[in-house]
């Protein structure tokens, strides 16, 4: 994947403002609320019975932070995303059996969270760069499935 200097700047510039714990928790909670069938992968997280329960669930919050922290690795390694996510792809495919479509859904949710938190900075050009990034990450995570 080729990244222009402008795309790299738009991605890293916004990423520097992201609160990984808060945005990660919000993104994962939104995924579980908007796409309730994704909850089956998180049965060990306890109470996911309502939006209030999901938003207040410390395991959702912790895993959301973990997910977004790992997304930060993509931002740091824009030119090597495929290898950056090789082990995570294997884990999600072989051990967790996560439907790879969920990676695309989470990417779309992350775009919404970023737009909500950084409306002024989230220009159409910024959105285009981030949309490209979440697609590349989703593809890298789904790689082991092919």
From Swiss-Prot:
InterPro entries: Globin (IPR000971), Globin-like_sf (IPR009050), Globin/Proto (IPR012292), Hemoglobin_b (IPR002337), Hemoglobin_oxygen_transport (IPR050056). The keyword Metal-binding applies. Residues 2-146 form the Globin domain. GO terms for biological process: hydrogen peroxide catabolic process. Pfam families: Globin. Red blood cells. Keywords: Heme, Iron, Metal-binding, Oxygen transport, Transport. The keyword Transferase does not apply. GO terms for cellular component: blood microparticle; haptoglobin-hemoglobin complex; hemoglobin complex. It comes from the Eukaryota. Heme b binds at residues 63, 92. GO terms for molecular function: haptoglobin binding; heme binding; metal ion binding; organic acid binding; oxygen binding; oxygen carrier activity; peroxidase activity. Heterotetramer of two alpha chains and two beta chains. PANTHER family: HEMOGLOBIN FAMILY MEMBER, HEMOGLOBIN SUBUNIT EPSILON. Involved in oxygen transport from the lung to the various peripheral tissues. Belongs to the globin family. This is Hemoglobin subunit beta/beta'.
């Amino acid at each position: 994947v080729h990244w222009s200097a402008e795309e790299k700047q738009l991605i890293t510039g916004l990423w520097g403002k992201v609160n990984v714990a808060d945005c990660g928790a919000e993104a994962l909670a939104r995924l579980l609320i908007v796409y309730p069938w994704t909850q089956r992968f998180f049965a060990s997280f306890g109470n996911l019975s309502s939006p209030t329960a999901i938003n207040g669930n410390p395991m959702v919050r912790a895993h959301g932070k973990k997910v977004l922290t790992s997304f930060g690795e993509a931002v740091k390694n824009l030119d090597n995303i495929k290898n950056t996510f090789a082990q995570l792809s294997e884990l999600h495919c072989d051990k967790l059996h996560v439907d790879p479509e969920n990676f695309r859904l989470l990417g779309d949710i992350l775009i919404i969270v970023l737009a909500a938190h950084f409306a002024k900075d989230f220009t159409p050009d910024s959105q285009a760069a981030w949309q490209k990034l979440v697609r590349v990450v989703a593809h890298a995570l789904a790689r082991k499935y092919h």
